[in-house]
Amino acid sequence: MKIIIFGLGKIYRDNAHLLPSQDEIVAYMDNNKELYGQCIDGVKVVSPMDIAVYEYDKVVIMSSYANEIRQQLLQLGVSEGRIVYGLQYIYERKIYDMPQAIVPEKRKKILIATSNLGYHGGAMVCIFLANALLEEGYSVTIAAPIGDAAFIKEYSQKGIQLEVLEGLPYAKFENIGWILKFDIVIANTYPMILLALEISERVRTVLWLHESKNVYSEMSFWRSDIEQKLLKTKLKIYAVSEMARDNFCGEVGYRKEQVTIFEYGIPSVLDGQADRNGTVTFAVVGTIYPLKQQKLFTDAVELLNKRQQNDNRFWIIGKIADQEYAKKILKQIENKPYIQYLGEKSQKELSALYDNIDVIVVCSKQESLPIVVVEAFMRGKTCIVCDNTGISKYITDKVNGYLYKTNDIGELAAAMQYFLDNKNVIAEMGKNAREVYEEHFSLEKFKMRLRKEIDWLEDNL
């Protein structure tokens, strides 16, 4: 096959070695004019404007701006069928070995396919789901295209079968025939929708949505294809919150009544309370990148008076995903000992820290159902939460949590000020938050919902 590679940035550099060796690259293209005329393995880098002079079967896009480049190619006269995303092109031809976990046994088998294994909400929900299914007597495997080594080691040692299958979101059914050995496949998170649609005609498949709007822009390259396949799929779709449902339906034109709200549940752990002599500890927990808006937190802390800053603690906890964004935050908190970045923590390490946390703060631009808030409620901790989150419907302001206007630094500072001025309400609001957990997010309630839905799937799909 003759192909043109469009895009020579990080995605190309990280994946060029995976391109099929039998394919002939006839040209490289990029929108960076400084690259024109250079050669890669004897093949020239040229302007996209020159595409008409080449004979090719496919244009393989190796860029995070895939949708924009597709539109550019369409305007240049390239047909839709000749445009393909690079990772999809690489992995849809890969033959996947059968996971080691699939062994002959009487128990029913469930595969949870997710986008990434690590110490973050989507993966932790998979762990909680897997444990609930194991307790119900199912054999469970979790598979993802990438994974954090420490996370995989920790939960493998706890008896959960974890598999890393590179390129899994783009796999073709003929290359994963072993998937028929599973009774149900749960595609966890929207980035797994291509796999879900690929297999849904042959195996009971559900899609469980958690996403905020930004994820849909990242998947916009496939929007038209997804919309068409959804019209005739047997796929059963769930969402963890009304916001997650509405984001999906607004993106692909799906009817809301066809999506079932299915909240997750987490196991119960009650923390102790350390004696801190009146010190209040506020914490933001989550991956460090712009969507989570940790800088909103640090900016709001700056609005408090010096005594309130120095007499209390303000923690940032999470893995750095955006180095430039993190540098701004770390620079800002230099020589400010009251604001600390504690780094990424395992679930065990985070549990130990919770004894010393009084109030969890959520600053995100949007969150469908942030697991950090559910975990805080489970632990009897109150939260400050922006109003543009799926969890806000469960919060009664100043009863079990505090709601503030999204992106409003002044309102966030006022929320922290409220707890500093009214320290006596923290424990009572935490107790009320625990009641929300018990009513909606306990593992017992989750397993009840799970049994009901699995029974429905087995009877109707």
Where are these regions (language model features)?
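A conserved mid-protein helix/loop that constitutes part of the nucleotide-sugar donor-binding site
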Residues: 120-128, 289-303, 410
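Short, structured helix-loop element that forms part of the nucleotide-activated donor/catalytic region
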Residues: 149-156, 244-247, 313-338, 349
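A short, active-site helix/loop in glycosyltransferases that binds the activated sugar's phosphate group
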Residues: 232-258
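Short alpha-helical donor nucleotide-sugar binding micro-motif in glycosyltransferases
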Residues: 344-345, 352-357
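Aromatic "clamp/platform" in nucleotide-sugar-dependent glycosyltransferases that forms part
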Residues: 365
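Short hydrophobic beta-strand element within catalytic cores of glycosyltransferases
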Residues: 382-385
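Conserved acidic donor-binding segment of nucleotide-sugar-dependent glycosyltransferases
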Residues: 397-398, 402-409, 418-423
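A short, well-ordered alpha-helix in the C-terminal region of glycosyltransferases
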Residues: 411, 418, 425-440, 446-452
